[in-house]
Design a protein with these regions (language model features):
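Active-site-adjacent structural elements that line small-molecule/cofactor binding pockets in enzymes
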Residues: 1-332
Length: 332
């Protein structure tokens, strides 16, 4: 069966409100939660970007049982040893309730260091070095490394009992296949079914193991016009695929290139409907593709009505299961 979780969008919701939403989601029956670690939003209209790591500590403490995950990009804005320390601390305090998905990053978050923004192949190579450093540190090893990142005699003094899962984040077949060599699972975002099948097949065919997670962007309101208007206002900057989504470096630039994006174009990237039955059907289709967890992101800034409606009317229609413990299958 599939876990249906809540995506906490730091780019759109103030941290205290987002914390209350995560608690509300658990109470409503969502089986998991996740967020992305961003320094800036995708649009000035979104208007927020709280610090994921401090929020995660509060969210794990405020909830009782659901696991949380974070999508993070080590290597530029974060030294991998700092990411390892953050992951290890949360996993130590909240065993079996935390996982981290690691990706190569986006310029909109990473440019703040003032360092050059590398090519995608270089970012992937840097990410792989970071993964190896993070995993070794979480196993209790002392690490020195000299490559695209430099580590000098780093050691974690506070360790979790078990190494939490390090998940690969991928939006393309090539990246999914590349992740298979090191990841404890895969997370991607909603796309046409055939493309999702290819991404999953690329990961599994390359030997990838562990659970498959899918983040689904959706917009719901009892009024269909409002549902579409909210999606267009909040998420039209997010219809652009790579390399634009990787390389644009400010919210203002995203707004500029999205000025003429139509509501109809947004509806190709966001599941928009006033019909809760339609949303349930869409989500079941994703589960039928083989995803073990489907993380729901309502793209509006107001989350309460969405959480309540989906908890009461959508989740009961789905073949859902509570999330199991967040554990890596084996040491790599």
């Amino acid at each position: 069966m599939t876990v249906y979780g809540f995506h906490a969008s730091h780019e759109q919701v103030p941290p205290a409100d987002l914390l209350a939403a995560a608690v509300r989601a658990e109470e409503a029956g969502f089986g998991a939660a996740m967020c992305s670690d961003h320094f800036s939003p995708w649009s000035v209209r979104q208007g927020e970007s709280g610090f994921a790591w401090s929020w995660l500590g509060a969210a794990l403490q405020a909830t009782d049982r659901i696991p949380f995950g974070v999508v993070n990009a080590p290597g530029q804005r974060y030294h991998p040893a700092i990411v390892a320390q953050a992951v290890g601390t949360l996993a130590s305090m909240y065993p079996d309730r935390f996982w981290a998905a690691l990706g190569s990053g986006e310029a909109s978050n990473e440019h703040i260091t003032g360092d050059r923004w590398p090519r995608k192949d270089v970012r992937n190579a840097r990410l792989r070095e970071c993964v190896d450093v993070i995993r070794a540190l979480l196993r209790g090893e002392e690490v020195s490394h000299d490559g695209l990142v430099t580590v000098d005699r780093a050691r974690l003094w506070s360790l979790p009992d078990t190494v939490p899962p390090l998940i690969g984040a991928a939006c393309s077949e090539a990246t999914a296949a590349w992740c298979a060599d090191w990841a404890d699972g895969l997370i991607t975002v909603n796309a046409p079914h055939e493309r999702l099948r290819r991404i999953v097949d690329a990961y599994r065919s390359a030997g990838g193991s562990g659970p498959l997670r899918l983040q689904v962007h959706l917009s719901w309101d009892p009024d269909p016009d409002t549902a579409l208007a909210v999606a267009h206002d909040q998420w039209r900057t997010n219809v652009h695929g790579p390399p634009a989504s990787w390389d644009l470096d400010t919210a203002e630039l995203f707004d500029g290139v999205s000025e003429h994006v139509t509501p109809e174009r947004v509806a190709e990237a966001v599941n928009v409907s006033a019909d809760l039955g339609q949303h349930a059907a869409w989500l079941q289709e994703y589960a039928d593709l083989g995803f073990d967890a489907v993380m729901l992101h309502h793209v509006g800034r107001e989350q309460s009505a969405f959480i309540d409606a989906f908890g009461a009317e959508v989740l009961p229609r789905l073949d859902a299961t509570p999330a199991g413990p967040a554990r890596a299958e084996e040491a790599r």
